[in-house]
A protein has these predicted regions:
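Feature responds to low-complexity, polar/acidic, surface-exposed segments characteristic
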Residues: 1-62, 70-96, 108-122, 134-147
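Catalytic cores of secreted/periplasmic or lumenal enzymes
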Residues: 99
Length: 147
């Protein structure tokens, strides 16, 4: 739920002159953010049916990228990352398109010198902060060269 909230807020900020007017909803605090994200094509309608337990489960790194991918549309490529060059993400994996797009746009660079992504690990707050800042501030994006 927290990832959806951040994604919805980023989307609104980028499309509303830097302003975020979203507020906690009901019956759950995250209801308004999920509705906004679905209504604006950020995430799929299936998230509306998630239980509170599902919404409060830590998000995996691959799903986090998927949730944030829909928050904006400017993913100008600054890196050349060939298909299947991320060591633990092949192009047929779930959310691979979004992950490769983030690498190519300089939003992600990998967790080691090989560019390993660790798609099924829980995302850390520090990683969330890096992704958010690179999405919002294009000058913060990083170059990466995968072997």
């Amino acid at each position: 739920a927290q990832a959806i909230k951040l994604s919805a807020a980023l989307h609104q900020m980028l499309n509303n002159n830097g302003k975020v007017t979203l507020r906690n909803g009901s019956p759950y605090w995250y209801s308004s953010y999920v509705s906004y994200a679905v209504d604006n094509g950020i995430i799929e309608k299936m998230y509306l049916d998630y239980t509170p337990a599902q919404m409060n489960t830590p998000v995996k790194r691959n799903e986090f990228v998927h949730i944030f991918y829909g928050a904006m549309s400017d993913y100008r490529q600054i890196n050349t990352v060939a298909d299947n060059k991320i060591p633990d993400v092949i192009t047929t994996d779930t959310y691979a398109l979004e992950i490769y797009t983030f690498y190519r746009a300089g939003i992600l660079t990998g967790s080691d010198k090989n560019g390993t992504f660790y798609p099924t690990n829980d995302i850390k707050r520090s990683e969330v902060a890096a992704i958010l800042s690179r999405m919002y501030d294009k000058t913060a994006r990083k170059t990466v060269s995968l072997p």
